[in-house]
Amino acid sequence: MTQDIWTSVDSYIVEMLLPADDVLDAAVRAADEAGLPSIQVSPPQGKFLHMLAKVQRARRILEIGTLGGYSTIWLARALPADGTLITMEIDRRHAEVARSNIERAGLSAKVSVLNGDAHDLLASLEKETGEAFDMTFIDADKASIPFYFESAMRMSRAGSLILIDNVVREGAVIDAASEDASVRGVRELNEMIARDARVSATVLQTVGVKGYDGLAIALVN
């Protein structure tokens, strides 16, 4: 199988199952025009996140890594009327684009975009948060995902979902000798989860327009 096939199948899935969406298209276009990297989740992946949040009946969602707000919009649309989503983004320009996209989507009342280092933002949020998050989506620097996961665990409850994107690294995750910080972060996370009796977890390998990677899904016991 080749990237061309993966991309073509993604296009087929979008054509068959994902109706045209002016708001999401505008979000991608605004991010591109602002020079943001085109590393947001694909439309089928965004729909998958949306469906998981619906199945979860999530009322509180935490997202670590906003980029231009594309996945944020997918997730926030799954929230009930009284739902809230907190998303964290280290890059000020990315956060500004995300806020604009979220406002265009009519979701500003439900979504808070926090701009800053997630290490600091999470530490503050842990002190402030009284109610657990029903779902957390981690799509930020992979070297730090063990820290992000532990913080998310402290703000979760039994039945909460924690999802971590880009955990296969085009297969590099199996290289125990890798010196790549992202690969090392993912491997450390996997080892942590494997030892952690608080969660049940798996990894789904993914292919598509975004290439070959994977999504970790952890259910808090």
PLM region spans:
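N-terminal auxiliary segments of SAM/dcSAM-dependent transferases
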Residues: 1-24, 34
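Beta-strand-loop-alpha "switch" segments that mediate conformational coupling across diverse proteins
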Residues: 27
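S-adenosylmethionine/decaboxylated-SAM
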Residues: 39, 43-221
